[in-house]
Amino acid sequence: MGSLGAILKHPEDFYPLLKLKIAARHAEKQIPSEPHWAFCYSMLHKVSRSFGLVIQQLGPQLRDAVCIFYLVLRALDTVEDDTSISTEVKVPILMAFHRHIYDNDWHFSCGTKEYKVLMDEFHHVSNAFLDLGSGYKEAIEDITMRMGAGMAKFICKEVETIDDYDEYCHYVAGLVGLGLSKLFHASGAEDLATDSLSNSMGLFLQKTNIIRDYLEDINEIPKSRMFWPRQIWSKYVDKLEDLKYEENSAKAVQCLNDMVTDALVHAEDCLKYMSDLRGPAIFRFCAIPQIMAIGTLALCFNNTQVFRGVVKMRRGLTAKVIDQTKTMSDVYGAFFDFSCLLKSKVDNNDPNATKTLSRLEAIQKICKNSGALTTKRKSYIIENESGYNSTLIIILFIILAILYAYLSSNLPNSL
């Protein structure tokens, strides 16, 4: 639930962390009794605890459809990511994956850890998929077919240009946005969003992940697969792996900032997409990851640590985002706060400074024009001055820990 040191440094995080921990335990207890659905929801919590929590915002039928959609695409992604599989074997599987989901005898052993279990026991996912309504099944099949074909295309193709980068991100994430919009519409809860707005929702998340995961991806064994476009990185270094070497730090940061600036172009579309949502459950499901994305970009921007180790939002801030995100006003507030943080990190000598500032100012203008930026709102990044000394904070921590133990044992269904 976050380290003691982090909580002492940010005591305001404790209550959101407490609520998140209780919510996580509550979600894990909501596993269905049917074996195939029990497998799917258990696997969902293993492959993505955060997604497993966010999905609980949705109503039962839509939640089941989104759960299966997510697991099908994680399985597809596992095949794509396994660099030990030859191209001759991998491409036909990707191309035919949309048919395999109808076959409850099909499985293909690949991946590691929980992903290997997902692939070995894929018949459970197929059985659950077959339980879904026809509108949900058609949407999942269509997106799986298009994504598999796109992944197959890029198995044999490098990401050379920014257009290639956008196309790849469309296949692996933009289509997720389109698919979710179809599922929301099939549920009767939302109007069908435009493809361009849905695509931007996926691209904003995917580009953030590609930026954040540079070091993990470049060091992948036996062979790395990289998605930073040559059109961007070749302006700064001769080889993409050169960015991780300390002697290239200045150029690496400029390249990183170029990548972040490219990702920011999708933020305005994301704000438009979220502002059009009607249902509070679907809204929270969509909004929380988008706030996490702009928060992660703010941490990565101008930060050499991206090339040295892991850069991610602290768990307490993640808990705060999940706790505080209720309305579009909260989203405008978060995007404004994180764009302010980004703006404060822009070096005027950076070759992309003008473009970066222009994109940040466009985001800030939308947030200001919304009328949501009241003086009473809670900031995501400006910490309150604390009058507590360390002893009082520790006492508070002990009291809250006792409260957490009490709530966990006596109020499991209070959320």
UniProtKB/Swiss-Prot annotation:
Disulfide bonds: none annotated. It catalyses: 2 (2E,6E)-farnesyl diphosphate + NADH + H(+) = squalene + 2 diphosphate + NAD(+); 2 (2E,6E)-farnesyl diphosphate + NADPH + H(+) = squalene + 2 diphosphate + NADP(+). CDD domains: Trans_IPPS_HH. The keyword ATP-binding does not apply. SUPFAM superfamilies: Terpenoid synthases. GO terms for cellular component: endoplasmic reticulum membrane. Pathway: Terpene metabolism; lanosterol biosynthesis; lanosterol from farnesyl diphosphate: step 1/3. It is found in: Endoplasmic reticulum membrane. One of its GO terms (molecular function) is squalene synthase [NAD(P)H] activity. Its EC number is 2.5.1.21. InterPro entries: Isoprenoid_synthase_dom_sf, Squ/phyt_synthse, Squal_synth-like, Squalene/phytoene_synthase_CS, Trans_IPPS_euk-type, Trans_IPPS_HH. Keywords: Endoplasmic reticulum, Isoprene biosynthesis, Membrane, Transferase, Transmembrane, Transmembrane helix. Signal peptide: none annotated. Induction: Induced methyl jasmonate (MeJA) in adventitious roots. Its cofactor is Mg(2+); Mn(2+). PANTHER family: FARNESYL-DIPHOSPHATE FARNESYLTRANSFERASE, SQUALENE SYNTHASE. Component of the triterpene saponins (e.g. ginsenosides or panaxosides) and phytosterols biosynthetic pathways. Catalyzes the biosynthesis of squalene. Belongs to the phytoene/squalene synthase family. This is Squalene synthase 11. It comes from Panax ginseng.
